[in-house]
Each structure stands twice: as C-alpha cells, then as structure tokens.
C-alpha cells in the first residue's frame, strides 16, 4: 500500500526514517535485499509529474523505478553504465533473476518502448543542456569517487532546466551528508528546502553488508542556467 506524505515534509533533505511512508511493491514486489528501496521509491515517486521530461540516472537493469516513470511522466529517459540497458532481452533476463520468470514474462511491452535508453557515464551524460525537468538518482552517488561525483553533479546541473530538480538518495557513511553544501557551492546547484544532517535515532539502517548503513535523501535545485 502506498501512502502520500505531506508536501512540505517531503521537500526536506535528511536521513530517511523508519516512520516514513514506504511501499513494498513498485511494478514488482520489491526484493527483500533492497532494504532501503521501499522508502526511496515511495519518496521519489512523489516528485513525478505528468508534464515532465525526466531522467533516471544510473537506473540499473531490473530496477523498476524507470518503468514506473513511463506511466507517470510525459517523456522518460534512463541511462546506465551497464550496456545491458540497451537490450530488451538482457533487461528481461535480469528481471527474471531478481523478481522471477513470471515478472519478466508479463512485463508490459510499453515499459520498454516508452523508455529512451542510453549507455552512459554520469560524468559525461549524452543529453543536451536544459533537457530535463527532473533527474532521479537513487542509491548511486555513494559508489562514485570524489572526482567522478563532482563531475556528475555538474552534468546534472547542465542537463536540468532552470528550477529543475535533482531527486537523489545515497548511502551513509559511503557518502557524507555534511558535504552536500560544499558540493552545491562548486556545481551550480542548491538544496531546495531545509537540510538536516543530524542522524535521528530512528534512521533506517542495514548491516546486511557488514558495517551499519543509513540512507539519506536530498532535493536539489538548479537555480539558473548551466
């Protein structure tokens, strides 16, 4: 079941909390190992608009958010470094591996035909300036080294329209929330609303991969021309 958060509350950049709305299904029932996705997807989907041209940046292969966007936005682009993003067959195979053969078999064809796909590096996006109303980047930034991450933010600034938004989540401590303001200062972006970097007692966390991991969300805005 999907809950709808208060509009003002969803704008705050902060740690994701256990009390936040979540969904266990987005196109497919979500994989149990994707511990933060129920919260991330439920939050991020609130920013989709029917008139938007959007990008799911580093979208993954089986990951369902890009498919969901095709039914809720005017034009949807998705890019990933993995060349399988260009292959319908490879996408279906990955869906079968993660969600089961029936999910792959019954994937509506329009999820693929409505999706403009590209193999791309976030530090060098193949899109024209000011193309997107919103860029979604879900649990990706923590995997980038500092130099690549800064170049990716500059690319996001370039491809966003003025007042366009970057809707991002990332794992902590692999990426530190207190660095966001520094990153904003050198990339032509700004935090849209309130930024709270203090970790609450009820922050969602996982020890699935060893040391505890938390998840942070950020609403970032392009204030002018790239």
Which ranges hold each PLM region?
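Conserved class I S-adenosyl-L-methionine
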Residues: 51-61
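A conserved beta-strand element that flanks and buttresses the S-adenosyl-L-methionine
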Residues: 136
């Amino acid at each position: 079941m999907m809950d709808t958060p208060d509009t003002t509350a969803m704008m705050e950049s902060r740690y994701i909390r256990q009390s936040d709305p979540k969904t266990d299904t987005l196109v497919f029932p979500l994989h149990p190992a994707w511990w933060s996705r129920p919260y991330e997807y439920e939050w991020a989907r609130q920013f989709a608009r029917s008139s938007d041209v959007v990008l799911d940046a580093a979208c993954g292969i089986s990951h369902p958010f890009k498919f969901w966007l095709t039914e809720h936005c005017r034009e949807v682009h998705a890019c990933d470094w993995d060349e399988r993003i260009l292959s319908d067959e490879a996408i279906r195979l990955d869906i079968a591996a993660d969600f089961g053969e029936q999910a792959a078999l019954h994937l509506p064809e329009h999820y693929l035909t409505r999706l403009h796909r590209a193999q791309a590096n976030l530090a060098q996006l193949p899109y024209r300036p000011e193309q997107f109303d919103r860029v979604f980047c879900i649990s990706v930034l923590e995997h980038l080294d500092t130099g690549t991450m800064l170049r990716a933010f500059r690319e996001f600034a370039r491809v966003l329209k003025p007042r366009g938004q970057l809707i991002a989540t990332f794992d902590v401590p692999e990426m530190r929330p207190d660095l966001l303001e520094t990153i904003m200062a050198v990339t032509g972006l700004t935090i849209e609303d309130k930024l709270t970097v203090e970790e609450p007692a009820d922050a969602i966390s996982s020890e699935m991969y060893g040391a505890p991991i938390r998840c942070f969300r950020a609403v970032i805005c392009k204030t002018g021309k790239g």
